[in-house]
Amino acid sequence: MKLTYHGQSTVTIETNGHHIVIDPFFSGNDQAMTKPEDVKADFILLTHAHADHMLDAEDIAKATGATIVATHELATYLSFKGLNVHPMNLGGQFEFPFGKVKMTQAFHSSSIIDEKKQTITYMGMPAGFLLTIEDKVIYHAGDTALFGDMALYGAHYDIDLAFLPIGDNYTMGPDDALVAADMLQAKTVVPVHYDTFDLIKQDAAAFCANLEAQGQTGQALKIDESIEL
């Protein structure tokens, strides 16, 4: 299985002929090296509705026929656009052709902002994902603050790889992410959601060094760099 980081919180997964995209944000990210029209997708997993996590979801889904997996409200909204969707909600699990997806809680918000109309439409709760693929467990926290129930995930799942936001301001920062990593006890932690904008500039190398200091492994992936599980 190959997992590739594309900047912000965007991750693609290739496994047994299946292509999964988490939080596609390519066209709006100046640092992105991949164009949305070049993305292969069978399933698109959305943690929430903010533009920096789903900006390219509609275009990719239309081009590929991919099924979008999201919370009930967000999935229903996207179904009105004629897209294939699979609605879920917090705590629910479903087995897809590529593996199991469990939707986890996240402490954040979820909305679609139309600046032209000056409207904000809330889209249900934000989420994270616990994926079980090829007997490996991957946790994508989405956008979230630190919360104590992360310890439950660490206790009940043998997490091989965790994608944790470190940008601060909108999500937990490096210090809280270190606490999260300790609770999750993932074998490897990859920082995400940083450096895309000035408000979330962080030193990912320093974060990984601090992970090492607390006995854990961190890996700050470059844009379009992959990791094999």
Swiss-Prot record:
The keyword Hydrolase applies. GO terms for molecular function: hydrolase activity. Keywords: Hydrolase. Coiled coil: none annotated. It comes from the Bacteria. Transmembrane segments: none annotated. The keyword Hydrolase applies. Belongs to the UPF0173 family. This is UPF0173 metal-dependent hydrolase Exig_1934. It comes from Exiguobacterium sibiricum (strain DSM 17290 / CCUG 55495 / CIP 109462 / JCM 13490 / 255-15).
